[in-house]
Amino acid sequence: TQHWDIAIAAADDGDAVEHMVEHTKVLITVIGPYSLYGDNVVAACARHGVDYVDLCGEVPFIRRSIDSHHAVAESTGARIVHSCGFDSVPSDIGMLNLYQAAGKPFARVQMVVDKLKGGISPGTIESSLQVSHAAHADKDVARNLHNPYSLDPDPKAGPRLDGLQNDFEIKEVDGVGWVGPFFMSMFNTRVV
């Protein structure tokens, strides 16, 4: 077995974050809201060439992170990887496997989760509230939330989605049963 040293720092303590980042290779952060606690952490990782991984489901934070830190991260070799949690990973890997099996892209895919255990963390609830407040306060944030390509490096390169929208209704599906929306689907469509 391999022993890994673990360093812990409060995200709102800039000096502690800086010290921690200077002494690590990979930083994993698992608590939001990232819009409150993540900017200086991503910035420090980008500056020091440290890889960064989070569970973020906040479109405004990720867009801001890309806009503010991509060039620096690219120059230092830091890999900034957002959205590595349940919100997106099963859909992302599922889409990759589906594409590899079919050998062609799809115009539309719906994912159904049969059984789900657990709950929503307080950090996720607070993150949702922060995103909602930001969207009400800033029309650009609201516009980005409704743009399925808001996190894409080239938003105009994606297919046109005229007439398509997220399906938020509860309905019966033949062979499946009753289905409803995944509460993170609006975010998930931006990263998968």
Regions found by a protein language model. Name each.
Residues Q2-I6, T76-A78:
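A short helix-to-beta-strand connector/capping loop
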Residues D5-V26, V30-Y37:
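Conserved Rossmann-fold cofactor-binding substructure of NAD(P)-dependent oxidoreductases
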Residues V26, D51, R79:
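Residue-level detector of anion-binding/catalytic polar loops
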Residues T29, P33, V42-R63:
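ADP-ribose/adenylate-binding Rossmann-like module
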Residues G38, C56-A78:
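Rossmann-fold NAD(P)-binding glycine/threonine-rich loop
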Residues V59-F61, C84-D92, L116:
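Gly/Ser/Thr-rich loops at beta-strand to alpha-helix junctions
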Residues H69-G85, P105-V109:
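Rossmann-fold dehydrogenase core element
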Residues Q100-V192:
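Active-site-lining helix/loop region of Rossmann-like oxidoreductase modules
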